[in-house]
């Protein structure tokens, strides 16, 4: 059984027992329960439910594990004939959520 949920302007495929990494959910602390009610798609035992735009009565329940930063992404801008370059780095915040159950 899996579902596709919408959160923070993006859609994610989730399954029970798996960990979902999303944009930082600043309203929740580690250990809090989070409920996704914007379920776009559910597949259970070969049965497919597609929402218009969301599946009625479906929700996904998870538990916030942590807030952390992802690995650093480095960018380099090289200026030819100037013998110089600019290096920049960025680390994006994310929230790790363990999916506990998918309810219909």
From Swiss-Prot:
GO terms for molecular function: rRNA binding; structural constituent of ribosome. PROSITE patterns: RIBOSOMAL_L21. GO terms for biological process: translation. The keyword Transmembrane helix does not apply. Pfam families: Ribosomal_L21p. GO terms for cellular component: cytoplasm; ribonucleoprotein complex; ribosome. It comes from the Bacteria. Keywords: Ribonucleoprotein, Ribosomal protein, RNA-binding, rRNA-binding. PANTHER family: 50S RIBOSOMAL PROTEIN L21, LARGE RIBOSOMAL SUBUNIT PROTEIN BL21M. Part of the 50S ribosomal subunit. Contacts protein L20. This protein binds to 23S rRNA in the presence of protein L20. Belongs to the bacterial ribosomal protein bL21 family. This is Large ribosomal subunit protein bL21. It comes from Thermotoga petrophila (strain ATCC BAA-488 / DSM 13995 / JCM 10881 / RKU-1). The lineage of its organism: Bacteria, Thermotogati, Thermotogota, Thermotogae, Thermotogales.
